[in-house]
Each structure stands twice: as structure tokens, then as C-alpha cells.
């Protein structure tokens, strides 16, 4: 989606980035430097920049040697239950930890207040960060390149996690 692809494009300017998607056509498009979403900046960067970016359907391949893994999956909101469905976020975090327990996990998905603390406890892992996105569709890469603010949250008292958060920001 636009959150994951925009952050992948931004980071791929100076880092090796492996994007994961479940849609083969999107993976093929990214690997052929064709944006699967409408975003003028992403399209321009794909055409003009030397990005260290590839995509795969194989999540384990992407997670195995990663220092950071950004989680940008849907969290649908049910207004009748006043509830965010975070099950996909939790599934992906579990897969990352199983494959690469040392990776710093950065959640970009929309989650409820207190989620980072609860998910750290659930998985007994302190290096899970939350960094909300403030992106407009069709302007996602522009908004990542020129952010109005950068916020990264983590568990308090974890100095090494604080350093990871500062590096990510």
C-alpha cells in the first residue's frame, strides 16, 4: 500500500530494502520499477533514482537479515464495536520475531493508544516501536520526504530501544 511503498522508497535511497507483499502483480511491478500505486513522487523516484529496493512474496527472505522491519498492514476500524482489528499486525510481528528475533520492529499501521506497550508485553520484546504516518494518498512519498513532524514511540527505560528509535527517525 501507499504507507509501506512510500517508506520503502524513502529508505531505499540509502539502505537495502526488501518489500513484502502478498499480491504477485505488485511484487512484479516494484521489481520492474513500476509503481503499483498512483503517487507522482514514487513514480518519479522509480524512474530516476538508483534505489536499492526489491520486492518479494517470501516474508522470511525479507525478514531474515533485516536490522529493521517496518510493519504497514491494514487495521480496519469497526465503528460499531469501536475497535481496530490489529490481528494482522500481530500475525506479522509474530512471523518477524520467529524469523529474526533481533530485528527492530517499527509499526506504521494505525493502532489504538497503548498498543505498543501491550504488544511488547505480549511478545516479551522491547524493540517494537510505533511511528504514526501522516500521509496523504497520492502524496505519500512527498509527505515522507518533507514531514511536518516525526514521532517514534517506544517503551520507556529502554536506552538501546531509544537509540534504535532515533536512528529510524
Q: What are the language-model segments listed below?
A:
Residues 1-169:
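Structural/interface elements that position substrates and couple domains in central-metabolism enzymes
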